[in-house]
């Protein structure tokens, strides 16, 4: 793709996100969603192959359906309130449709079907944008309509997402699909805490984006997309492979890594609000995610995949791609736990 065209498209994606975040008018929010969706598709199709085309088509159809649901909710709200302002959804049907549309855009269960397939079919750089930047817009709208959200519906979607995110990743060998199911589970954690403490949802979103960005940048540096190719990078880049595995464990929420912080704080906040059964179920289900991350770490470090690769240790002579942000992101993705007392300002 021509670099100038790519920059223009990327700026359009950012503009669409900005329009949604600063708007208080439903029509402008819908326009921002559409700009964002239509601009991301050429980025997903950077590599012209059938898989990228199919993934982009799936993404377009799913997001178009979600946009139609969103517009229907806006029109129902307009009929009952007579205003376009984002203040309150005046009808339960509008609230339900809006929540379902945003859940579909976020890739939450039971609307998660598109996330693994789309992520698997596109390049790593496009997958990074899809699983990080594209979550900002729906989350910002959920944050704005928080007083009107049906609590039972949003918590049901949350617990379903955490379960599907754990179960779906168990039999995967493709790293992009593992990241997609991890994203589904993290969306569940974020929306679960949203009704109780919206500020904590923002903290969780920041940590999630940091960890996911680190993972994708490490995958791009290692040129790995499967568990087999990850295990074979020990010979070439042992330090980078170690960072991949530590960050994976952080995403699973293993203490004392950064990924443990949001889970700990979310469970603590929910128990303070006399919700006991739901956080217990969430904590147990989160073990599924941790299990497949630990299994991946074990199989990569302590066992050797069947391979005809007889290459010797090349890491002393290999040159790696220079990535400026990677050291900072890696530190943030793994070592935030000692800073947890500072987060008492969220109380």
Curated annotation (Swiss-Prot):
The chain crosses the membrane at residues 3-23, 25-45, 66-86, 96-116, 122-142, 145-165, 178-198, 200-220, 237-257, 274-294, 325-345. It is a multi-pass membrane protein. Its main location: mitochondrion. It catalyses: a ubiquinone + NADH + 5 H(+)(in) = a ubiquinol + NAD(+) + 4 H(+)(out). It comes from the Eukaryota. The keyword Nuclease does not apply. Pfam families: NADH_dehy_S2_C (PF06444), Proton_antipo_M (PF00361). GO terms for molecular function: NADH dehydrogenase (ubiquinone) activity. Core subunit of the mitochondrial membrane respiratory chain NADH dehydrogenase (Complex I) which catalyzes electron transfer from NADH through the respiratory chain, using ubiquinone as an electron acceptor. Essential for the catalytic activity and assembly of complex I. Belongs to the complex I subunit 2 family. This is NADH-ubiquinone oxidoreductase chain 2. It comes from Capra hircus (Goat).
């Amino acid at each position: 793709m021509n670099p100038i065209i790519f920059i223009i498209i990327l700026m359009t994606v950012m503009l669409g996100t900005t329009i949604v975040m600063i708007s208080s008018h439903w029509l402008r929010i819908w326009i921002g969603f559409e700009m964002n969706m239509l601009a991301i598709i050429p980025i997903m199709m950077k590599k012209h192959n059938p898989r990228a085309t199919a993934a982009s088509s799936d993404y377009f159809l799913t997001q178009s359906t979600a946009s139609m649901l969103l517009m229907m909710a806006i029109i129902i709200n307009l009929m009952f309130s007579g205003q376009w302002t984002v203040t309150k959804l005046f009808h339960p049907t509008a609230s339900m449709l809006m929540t379902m549309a945003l859940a579909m855009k976020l890739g939450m269960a039971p609307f998660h079907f598109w996330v693994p397939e789309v992520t698997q079919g596109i390049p790593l750089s496009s997958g990074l944008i899809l699983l990080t930047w594209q979550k900002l817009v729906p989350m910002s709208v959920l944050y704005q309509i928080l007083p009107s959200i049906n609590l039972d519906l949003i918590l049901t979607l949350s617990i379903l997402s955490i379960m599907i995110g754990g179960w779906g990743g168990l039999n995967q060998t493709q790293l992009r699909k593992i990241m997609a199911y991890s994203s589904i589970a993290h969306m569940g954690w974020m929306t679960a805490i949203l009704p109780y403490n919206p500020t904590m949802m923002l903290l969780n979103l920041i940590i999630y984006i940091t960890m996911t960005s680190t993972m994708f940048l490490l995958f791009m540096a290692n040129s790995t997309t499967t568990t087999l190719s990850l295990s074979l990078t020990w010979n070439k880049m042992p330090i980078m492979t170690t960072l991949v595995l530590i960050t994976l464990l952080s995403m699973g929420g293993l203490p004392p890594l950064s990924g443990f912080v949001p889970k700990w704080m979310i469970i603590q906040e929910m128990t303070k609000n006399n919700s006991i059964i739901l956080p217990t179920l969430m904590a147990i289900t989160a073990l599924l995610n941790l299990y497949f991350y630990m299994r991946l770490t074990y199989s990569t470090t302590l066992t050797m995949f069947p391979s005809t690769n007889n290459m010797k240790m090349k890491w002393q002579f290999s040159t790696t791609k220079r990535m400026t942000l990677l050291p900072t992101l890696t530190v943030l993705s793994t070592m935030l736990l000692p800073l947890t007392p500072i987060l008492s300002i969220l109380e």
